[in-house]
UniProtKB/Swiss-Prot annotation:
Biological process according to GO: glycine decarboxylation via glycine cleavage system
N6-(pyridoxal phosphate)lysine carried by residues: 273
Record Pfam families: GcvP2_C (PF21478), GDC-P (PF02347)
Enzyme class: oxidoreductase
GO cellular component: cytosol; glycine cleavage complex
Source taxonomy: Bacteria, Bacillati, Bacillota, Bacilli, Bacillales
Catalytic activities: N(6)-[(R)-lipoyl]-L-lysyl-[glycine-cleavage complex H protein] + glycine + H(+) = N(6)-[(R)-S(8)-aminomethyldihydrolipoyl]-L-lysyl-[glycine-cleavage complex H protein] + CO2
Enzyme Commission designation: 1.4.4.2
Protein name: Probable glycine dehydrogenase (decarboxylating) subunit 2
Organism: Staphylococcus epidermidis (strain ATCC 12228 / FDA PCI 1200)
Length: 502
């Protein structure tokens, strides 16, 4: 009954089969037509799947056994910080006083929740070196957009509305130019130098009177620390622009150096990365934004403040860009992040970064004789290697990533950043053991050897997974997003087969 490819729950459906019987209704039946306008009433019976309770349980248990996550295997997905999420976080998030509270309750009834929000704001201010922090943004890109809208409001307030350009490095996350566009800015690219850092001369070339900001990650997406960050800040600030810190790589510098100390005016953090909020399955995430004093009056409202021994919402933010997320934001992630920060303490967070950097450099050192390493200096928490050596045997980085699946390892990020040919970005995080790192390294070395001696083994990978190579082109151009579309597609397949047989 269980096959490699699981049928959809709709395909398991059998008419009049059900999992649960409702008790007999002793309330008078009222026609829904008497309660709702006709336009809201379904014209046809909903096509819900009809399955037994046992089939229902088996279906979702089967699917869950096919999931892959940090709890099941190594997940070195570069720029994503797929670290272990401590289970104490889940215990705290399930405390009934938090999990059963309602965002519309009166302030005096949710003092505990407001205290968590306020306390987390204070912790993040200290960690980042910012003067104020809002927790509202729902994820990293939302945080980017929020910060850029603050920049935009600041420039407009100061008679600088002509500033419509945001500088992004050629190694930047794709969300950076996308967020700039959503905020109404144009993106201008600054090149990297031979060391993988921002090219200072090119920066001087692109900075002008229209520069609103520069968006940087430090360490950058190549895993390299921008040693000239103070000079970069001086160049942009003297031109009237602002510095924005993309917090995707904060895991490398905790309690070592703070964005505020590097001269950044705003920062977003990923609580679902650095601070162990789970981010598998698409979310929920959380992307708090911190700003320096001159931008504090532009933050989204309300803020949570402490008034003597009570916590309350503060809507008195004169230049606020307005609310960017309903109610508290993603409060459950706040709880997990706050638990993590308080559990680790300052020394623990410092050790996090030290171990993350050590692990990345250990892998890089052991792989340098088997793969092209574009940048030879010590990396921070991640690094990028190139598959150009393997390409001469007809094997690409994509093929090697597929082969890694046979070893029970989630592939690293591939073909990113864009300025490395056949790039593979590896971020092991601090939570992995040396034994796990060695297993991954040995797998990579074996794959490198196979590309020379048995390339077909790599080209035809994966060999052990439920699904092998996807037809990604067709999936992108002709996506099947609804069960009705799947039925239509299967009908076409059967029709074509019948035609060929005849």
């Amino acid at each position: 009954m269980i096959s490699k490819s699981s049928p959809l729950i709709f395909e398991r459906s059998k008419k009049d089969r059900y999992a649960y019987s409702l008790p007999q209704n002793d309330i008078e039946n009222i026609s829904i037509a008497s309660l709702l306008d006709d336009k809201y009433i379904r014209k046809h019976k909903a096509e819900f799947p009809e399955v037994s309770e046992l089939d229902l349980v088996r279906h979702y248990t089967e699917l869950s056994n096919k999931n892959f996550g940090v709890d099941t295997g190594f997940y070195p997905l570069g720029s994503c910080t797929m670290k272990y999420n401590p289970k104490i976080n889940e215990k705290v998030a399930r405390i009934s006083g938090f999990s059963e509270s309602h965002p519309l309750q009166e302030e005096e009834h949710v003092q505990g929740s407001l205290e968590i929000i306020y306390s987390l704001q204070e912790e993040l201010k200290e960690i980042t070196g910012m003067d104020e922090v809002t927790l509202q943004p729902a994820a990293g890109a939302h945080g980017e957009w929020t910060a850029l809208m603050i920049f935009k409001a600041y420039h407009e307030k100061n008679g600088q509305s002509h500033r419509d350009e945001v500088i992004v490095p050629d190694s930047a996350h794709g969300t950076n130019p996308a967020s700039a566009s959503f905020a109404g800015f144009k993106s201008v690219t600054v090149k990297s130098n031979q060391r993988g850092e921002v090219d200072i001369e090119d920066l001087k070339r692109v900075v002008n009177d229209n520069t609103a900001a520069i968006m940087l990650t430090n360490p950058n997406t190549l895993g390299i620390f921008e040693q000239n960050i103070i000079e970069i800040g001086k160049i942009v600030h003297e031109a009237g622009g602002l510095l924005y810190y993309d917090g995707a790589n904060l895991n490398a510098i905790l309690d070592k150096v703070r964005p505020g100390d590097m001269g950044f005016d705003a920062v977003h953090l990923n609580l679902h990365k650095t601070f162990t909020g789970p981010h598998g399955g698409g979310g929920p995430g959380s992307g708090p934004v911190g700003v320096v004093e001159k931008l504090a009056s532009y933050l989204p409202k309300p803020m949570v403040i402490k008034d003597n021994d009570r916590y309350k919402y503060d809507n008195d933010i004169p230049n606020s860009i307005g609310r960017v997320k309903p109610f508290y934001g993603n409060f459950g992630i706040y709880l997990r992040a706050y638990t993590y920060i308080r559990s680790m303490g300052a020394n623990g967070l410092k050790e996090v970064s030290e171990a993350a950097v050590l692990n990345a450099n250990y892998i890089k050192s052991r792989l340098k004789n088997h793969f092209e390493i574009p940048f030879n200096q010590y990396c921070k928490h991640e690094f990028v290697l190139s598959g150009t050596l393997q390409k001469q045997y007809g094997v690409r980085t994509l093929d090697m990533a597929k082969r890694l699946l046979d070893f029970g390892v989630h592939p690293p990020t591939i073909y990113f950043p864009l300025n490395v040919e056949e790039g593979m970005m590896i971020e092991p995080t601090e939570t992995e053991s040396k034994e796990t790192l060695d297993y991954f390294i040995d797998a990579m070395i074996q794959i490198a050897d196979e590309t020379k001696n048995d390339p077909d083994k790599v080209l035809e990978a994966p060999h052990t997974t439920i699904i092998d190579r996807l037809d990604e082109t067709t999936a992108a151009r002709k996506p099947i997003l609804k069960f009705e579309e799947l039925k239509d597609e299967k009908y076409k397949e059967h029709t074509n087969i019948d035609s060929e047989d005849n």
